[in-house]
Amino acid sequence: MLPTREEALKLIRDGLLFNPGPWGKHCLTAAHCAEKIASACGDMDVEKAYILGLLHDIGRKFGVRHLGHVYDGYVYMKSLGYDEVAKICLTHSFNNHTIDEYIGKFDVTDEELTIIKTEVAKTIYDEYDRLIQLCDCLAGAEGVLDIENRMNDIKKRYGFYPQDKWNSNMNLKQYFEGEMNKDIYLICEKDTFATGNL
């Protein structure tokens, strides 16, 4: 089950009341990219793509956490009965089915970590998981970013960027460009899209 677009926007607005920050605009940009790419692919549910892109970071509602936001989003969406969104909250950070490539602090309890590991290991990724992984990498708070520039920025901030994750993001870009037969930055309106307000 999925929330409607308006329900999803309300969830983000409510989340920003608890934890204001640029994550809300990042989510809007990810949703924009997901909608545009899904539409250009032709065989994806555009509304579903938008909603999943919008809510992938909803765990940020519960405060400033790194790996913790994955757990928080997963549990929160499960509690509302939005299992497809819960899955995306979990999978968007793990391109290669492993938490070893997570960039950021492991600020979770042992129990939370076990749940994340167990759920990631048994999850079968689909086109929407892959799409949101790509869109997470494309989305800045102010607009659409160049993927390599974004990964380099993360590498500078954290001191590393796992090569497997880097390669996976570039492969996702190539894959979806092949599906669309178009340049990803043109489809996502990189040079013209400006993230609005929620």
Regions found by a protein language model. Give the residues of each.
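Acidic-glycine-rich active-site phosphate/pyrophosphate-binding loop
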Residues: 2-8, 48
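Divalent metal-dependent phosphate-bond-processing catalytic cores, especially two-metal-ion Mg2+/Mn2+ enzymes
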Residues: 3, 16-43, 55, 80, ...
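A short small-residue
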Residues: 8-16
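His-Asp-centered metal-binding catalytic motifs of divalent-metal-dependent phosphohydrolases/nucleases
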Residues: 30, 46-82, 86-97
